[in-house]
Amino acid sequence: MNFESFILPHIWNLKPYSSARDEFKGKEGVFLDANENPLGSGLEDHWNRYPDPLQLKIKEQLATIKFCNIDQIFLGNGSDEAIDLIMRMTCQSGVHNIILCPPTYGMYEVSASINHIEQRKVSLTKDYQLDVDGILQTIDDNTRLLFLCSPNNPTGNKLNRSDIYTLVESFKTGFVIIDEAYIDFSDEPSFILELAKYPQIIVMQTLSKAYGLASLRLGMAFAHPSIIRLLNKIKPPYNIGGATQEIVYKALSHPSFKEESVQLILSERTRLIESLKKINGVIQIYPSDANFILVHFKRANDLFNYLIEAKLITRNRSSVALCEDSIRITIGISQENDKLVELITHFYSA
């Protein structure tokens, strides 16, 4: 597939910043090239040297874990950096548009607004699936990006895979962004495995959820190598700090924690759902393929405030279209989930 028409001409022609670590990649020698402090950092660990701008050690690990090649991986300061760079790479304000399918992750809209890009919204159906016909009717020659979040946030469900395939095969003027932030909690295979067949796909994932590394802010984009080269071309030169790279490398070297965490969260998700089903104030618990559930409650706003007073924090989604009177609940450890059930039971029995 020819990506050239999807990318803004000045991005193709851009001469990127060349950092000191781009020009010399060796680890041994006397380094007088980057204006670093030769005395160290004054800390136990030495952070005075700039980090690898392409994070190759981490990418080698991820290539094995994700069954892809190193040149198909981009690492960003959270997935939000990848979202922003993709928009700036493809969309010109006043010319191009993107398609969003609310309710969905809010940063797509925020990033588009910051970049002054037209947003066309095609709401999910009542069962939180894609309105394929509506999306296809909304696409025009200036549509550059279609954002799909699966499993979806804030609803928790995975999108029908057949619908995603239909859109990927029908959308000819831009990229389909598939946000898989919660894929580790789903039995659905990642679309990373489809990159060779569908080079117009960009898949996003994160280490913030299943890997428990939210504080480090490391997001991943997986795409055709030519797209990864462009993302690396326009990113800040050292967008992933050295401390983050070291910690992530250690975490990825011990995959058992992630696997055990996922199994525990899935088990607790099932247990919490069964407990909530017994409470009269619960109207509906929506299907979840994530580490959270969306629950439709009677008097959801009052319940949310009651939980806040008890210092149990959930996310009130009642103001979001199609999520009226609903609260998003992250799956906690067993004691936290038991406390939640106890408080909700007390609220509706009072």
Task: Indicate where each model-derived feature is located.
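N-terminal "arm"/small-domain region of PLP-dependent enzymes with the aminotransferase-like
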Residues: 1-64
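Short, conserved charged micro-motifs
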Residues: 43, 299-306, 336-339
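Phosphate-binding glycine-rich loop
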Residues: 56-97, 115
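PLP-dependent aminotransferase-like
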Residues: 92-148
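Active-site pre-lysine segment of PLP-dependent enzymes
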Residues: 113, 132-141, 154-176, 180-213
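PLP-dependent enzyme catalytic core of the Aspartate aminotransferase-like
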Residues: 162, 309-310, 319-350
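PLP-dependent aminotransferase class I/II
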Residues: 200-278, 285
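Conserved PLP-binding catalytic core of the aspartate aminotransferase-like
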Residues: 265-266, 278-310
